[in-house]
Amino acid sequence: MARSDDADSRAARWEKEAHDLSTQVAFLQEELALVRRKLTESPRHVRQLEERLAAAQAQLARLTENNERLVSTLKEARAQIVTLKEEIDRLAQPPSGYGIFLERHDDGTVDVFTGGRKLRVAVSPSLDVAELCRGQEVLLNDALNIVDAFGYERAGEVVMLKEVLAGPDGAPGDRALVVSHSDEERVVHLAETLIGAAIRAGDSLMIEPRSAYAYERIPKSEVEELVLEEVPDVDYTDIGGLHAQIEQIRDAVELPFLHADLFREHQLRPPKGILLYGPPGCGKTLIAKAVANSLAKKIAERRGEEKHTSYFLNIKGPELLNKYVGETERHIRLIFQRAREKAGEGTPVIVFFDEMDSVFRTRGSGVSSDVENTIVPQLLSEIDGVEGLENVIVIGASNREDMIDPAILRPGRLDVKIKIERPDAEAAKDIFSKYILSGLPLHPDDLAEHGGEPQATVAAMIDAVVLRMYSETEENRFLEVTYANGDKDVLYFKDFNSGAMIQNIVDRGKKMAIKEFLTSARKGLRLQHLLDACVDEFRENEDLPNTTNPDDWARISGKKGERIVYIRTLVSGGKGADAGRSIETASNTGQYL
């Protein structure tokens, strides 16, 4: 019985355990199914999580970008607020005035000129008072204190400097006497830029009338035309056919300059001036330029210097004339004043008046407006004033010396008178040799005729061209002139030849050689080119004598003597072959040589 109860209890326990186990198995099966289901669904869940994570990251980036944009916008807004505040503050500030700095004081204050008043004001600590210069423009605040400094005034009135007033104890002056356009004299202050500067009487200065300060030297064309310029590099060797005249001018100019002690020992006064007269185009201006260059070289050699310097005032007559009364005389004074300044430094100065007859005509002749009644005396006084200077000489050039006032030509003024003649045949050869050189491209045919020698070819060309120009043949007949006494004379082209015409002939020939090379590829200058150039030059000049007054034309051309009343051209086959006409002169004026 006991054994049966025990078995029942064990069976019941086993049954219970079996039930529990089956329950656990069922639970585990459910868990296993759940796990299997989760394992099946986990990749999709992971993808969803990844997608959500990516979306969250993208949203975070957008939010970050928006945040940065908002921060930047906020900064810009703050900057704009600050700028607008500064702009409002600036616009609300009272206006600032400008003034002219005058003088500084030991207590740190300065004097300024503003609004027509002279004030003593303070200076901002940010500015160095020692750096302020007289005449400088300064900025004043509402309390009229200097807060900034600028440059100098750049606009104002132009006046002429008459004199720089010396300072105490011979120090450089800081004031000047100036003359306005209304001839009103005024004393002005010189700005720092002009104190001690190389300004001289006659210079144009820019002033500010209210503050009475002169700021700047203004170059004016009417004055700068007369400024000394260094001599061009022209030597006597560049001039052909004028050996005798060059020797004369050397004796007149170089000897007194180079041997001044001998002249003083012999009590010989050097000439003050030279007149070069003769027909146009014969080298008067060229000689004047060569004089200064040669003189400077000789002085440099004598002093043992390498660099030679001289100055050449090339004054063309018509440039001096001015419609305002007294201006021409002022220009003449300015010319000689500049010459004296440079001559005082020991530098030779040549004052060259070209076309002298256009300004310094005979007084009282009635030929012009009689402006020479005051111009000629001004020149005479200046020439006489050059007497004490050892380094200035006046050279005048004219092709109508008979119209120059006799007082200028008398001894003691233009002492030496040198006639620059038209070149003869030998002189023409010399001039041609300056332009036709053996280094030029010569045509092979011409070279072959002279054994291939360039020198011989050039010499033959020159001889042939000069023979063509100077032969008294029918083709070279130019004019038949009739004088007032009834005499007639035939003039040839050689009677009107000049250095300028020779140069023009050579230039024409060279141009023909170039054109022939471009068309036929045959290079080189030929004799025929020069002969054709002679013909063209003659043809071009055949109409020139047909002027209103044949006698005046003849005098300008260098033909002096009996008055000419009739001119007839003799050029055959030209456009002026029948151009003869009779023209009576209005009056018998001038001195006939």
From Swiss-Prot:
The keyword Chaperone applies. It comes from Salinispora arenicola (strain CNS-205). Residues 592-593 are annotated as: Docks into pockets in the proteasome alpha-ring. SMART domains: AAA. Pfam families: AAA (PF00004), Prot_ATP_ID_OB_C (PF16450), Prot_ATP_ID_OB_N (PF17758). Homohexamer. Assembles into a hexameric ring structure that caps the 20S proteasome core. Strongly interacts with the prokaryotic ubiquitin-like protein Pup through a hydrophobic interface; the interacting region of ARC lies in its N-terminal coiled-coil domain. There is one Pup binding site per ARC hexamer ring. Upon ATP-binding, the C-terminus of ARC interacts with the alpha-rings of the proteasome core, possibly by binding to the intersubunit pockets. This is Proteasome-associated ATPase. InterPro entries: AAA+_ATPase (IPR003593), AAA_ATPase_domain (IPR050168), ATPase_AAA_core (IPR003959), ATPase_AAA_CS (IPR003960), NA-bd_OB-fold (IPR012340), P-loop_NTPase (IPR027417), Prot_ATP_ID_OB_2nd (IPR032501), Prot_ATP_ID_OB_N (IPR041626). ATPase which is responsible for recognizing, binding, unfolding and translocation of pupylated proteins into the bacterial 20S proteasome core particle. May be essential for opening the gate of the 20S proteasome via an interaction with its C-terminus, thereby allowing substrate entry and access to the site of proteolysis. Thus, the C-termini of the proteasomal ATPase may function like a 'key in a lock' to induce gate opening and therefore regulate proteolysis. Keywords: ATP-binding, Chaperone, Coiled coil, Nucleotide-binding, Proteasome. PROSITE patterns: AAA. Pathway: Protein degradation; proteasomal Pup-dependent pathway. ATP binds at residues 281-286. Belongs to the AAA ATPase family. GO terms for biological process: modification-dependent protein catabolic process; proteasomal protein catabolic process. It comes from the Bacteria. Residues 5-94 form a coiled coil. Residues 574-593 are annotated as: Disordered.
